[in-house]
Design a protein with these regions (language model features):
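Ligand-binding clefts of soluble mixed alpha/beta catalytic domains
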Residues: 1-356
């Protein structure tokens, strides 16, 4: 977007705006003032910052037109020319040896489950040359989306960000991730998901805003995707939020977990308070009893091995092995044959792959 416009950018796959130059709105400031009496300027109403941080309509805010063009060039390098073509790849020989840089991931997760860390570190260690092109970086920062390459092949990245809202999913994050997964599915780009999610963000505003309806968009996006889906659980994977983040239950092809992964309905404190409410209430020292029960719960359930035994996780790996393991899984899926028939889903209604755009259009030749 280089000037002023209205509705049409919303039906595109990606929208790039230039700060202080681009503006989008359905009704302009003059009409709004006449109808509602509100005083608002062009920049505040529909500027690049507004649509990148608040509305989520735009995917990137460029500093100038040159920056915008460079971003678009980078973006197009990950996408095919149409939804029936292969994504552009530059195959290179896999280097599966564990390096010192890979071993840095072994110390990424803090000892305290409540201490945040930057998920960008995990993402960049897995991608070729640590190159990651983020989309909608300023909108719903509690979830990360973007593109990178694994062994020269484009992949889409979806990841919870513990640095924001502890990685909780909310309305904006759910819709942001769902649209991105659908975009990857439409253009034959595999999806690599990093999970550290304690749940959906609680709150009256979230419930009134329709978190049930809008959060379900992420379920549909993953469940209907026909591209390879690879998921890595780094730490928390609790409740319904775990299910919607590319879980095995939604048909993901390869689900990996680090030893620090915690796969459960909820965290230890919440579970103990519900399951052992009467025991704690009757105890002489409720705090000590609660702490003991929490420790038992963590030892018995808050680990990836129970999930692995039940088939919810395919392998428990060291963080330093994430790059090589996900690389093998991703590339082998890409090389599996016809790019339009990578996975079989219950949504298929004919022999052709159901190709869905982010706007939920379906094209089946």
């Amino acid at each position: 977007v280089r000037g002023r416009c209205g509705l049409l950018p919303a039906i595109t796959d990606f929208t790039v705006m230039v700060d202080q130059t681009s503006h989008m709105f359905i009704t302009g400031p003059d009409v709004i003032k006449t109808v509602t009496g509100e005083d608002v300027g062009f920049e505040e109403l529909g500027g690049a910052r507004t649509h990148n941080t608040t509305s989520g309509v735009a995917h990137h805010m460029a500093g100038d037109e040159k920056d915008a063009i460079e971003y678009v060039k980078s973006l197009l390098s990950y996408l095919p020319s149409n939804n029936l073509s292969e994504a552009p790849a530059f195959p290179e020989e896999a280097d599966l040896a564990t390096t010192d840089e890979d071993r840095e991931l072994d110390t990424l997760i803090p000892d305290s489950a409540n201490q945040p860390y930057d998920m960008h570190t995990a993402i960049e260690h897995v991608l070729d040359d640590a190159e990651f092109l983020e989309t909608q970086a300023l909108f719903a920062p509690n979830i990360i989306t973007g593109f990178g390459r694994v062994e020269g092949h484009p992949v889409g990245i979806v990841a919870n960000q513990p640095m924001q809202f502890a990685g909780c999913l909310d309305i904006d994050a759910s819709e942001k991730a769902a649209r991105f997964v659908r975009t990857c599915d439409a253009f034959n780009v595999p999806v690599l998901t990093f999970v550290d999610v304690p749940g959906f963000l609680p709150g009256v505003d979230q419930e009134y805003g329709g978190i049930i309806r809008r959060g379900a968009k992420l379920i549909y996006a993953y469940a209907e995707a026909t591209v390879p889906l690879i998921t890595v659980i780094t730490r928390k994977a609790f409740g319904g939020a775990y299910d919607v983040m590319g879980s095995k239950h939604l048909g993901a092809d390869l689900n990996l977990a680090w030893p620090t992964a915690q796969v459960a309905v909820m965290g230890a404190q919440g579970a103990v308070n519900i399951l052992h409410r009467r025991t704690i209430a009757a105890a002489e020292d409720p705090d000590a009893t609660r702490a003991e029960l929490m420790a038992d719960y963590e030892d018995a359930l808050l680990n990836p091995y129970v999930a692995a035994e039940r088939g919810y996780v395919d392998a428990v790996i060291m963080p330093s092995d994430t790059g090589s393991t996900s690389s093998r899984g991703c590339v082998s899926s890409v090389r599996s044959g016809n790019p339009c028939l990578r996975r079989s889903t219950a949504t298929s209604r004919c022999s052709h792959r159901p190709i869905r755009s982010p706007a939920h259009r379906e094209v089946c030749p």
